[in-house]
């Protein structure tokens, strides 16, 4: 029992240390990139950061840096979540905890982000987002807080990348393409820029819609001898793109806007109570 507990603690610590190191490395590169890039604003800032991301991806695939980055080869020598699976005496897996461990670490990161957003630094970030001129007039150091926001968000992005690599049990630079970046940005836009719970909801909806609910559209379907037109490989993404465009057009601020789920629930309860009180008042009147 003692050796088992010691092994479990060692395994957990190795994963935690790897996640923290991944976040710190991402934060360090963000600090280096942020020195010249954060002088830009709006679309120029987005284009510059995307450009640097592609440059870094190309550098990490450079074969001459193979001894350091493993080049374009697949990297597997790091802790993975499969170690958390519970096995029987015969060696067969009886409980796949590797599926749930990423959710635990994700919830921990979300809790830390919520604490940050509700802190004095988080309020400063919101003030800069809403109006930089007004924020500077209030005495907020724009350069300092922009850099802090950039580095902090990159830290959590690094942790997310490490979670992804540990879940699939391998890492390769070519996997992290600009397409993945656009998907993440799209999830944020759908959920609502400035809403943590909105991003969480949009993540589940995005994955469920693109990978599960519309999967049947990729399969050729026959009704008797008649072949249903359009239903073929790739049609799923066409329909999914149309759904995304409709959502963006009709929900300009995303599903949640800048609100959080508790605020939406509280507002819904208040409206329900107001309608109930109004009905009771009209009935008594």
Give the positions of each predicted feature.
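Transmembrane alpha-helices and adjacent helix-loop boundaries
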Residues: 1-285
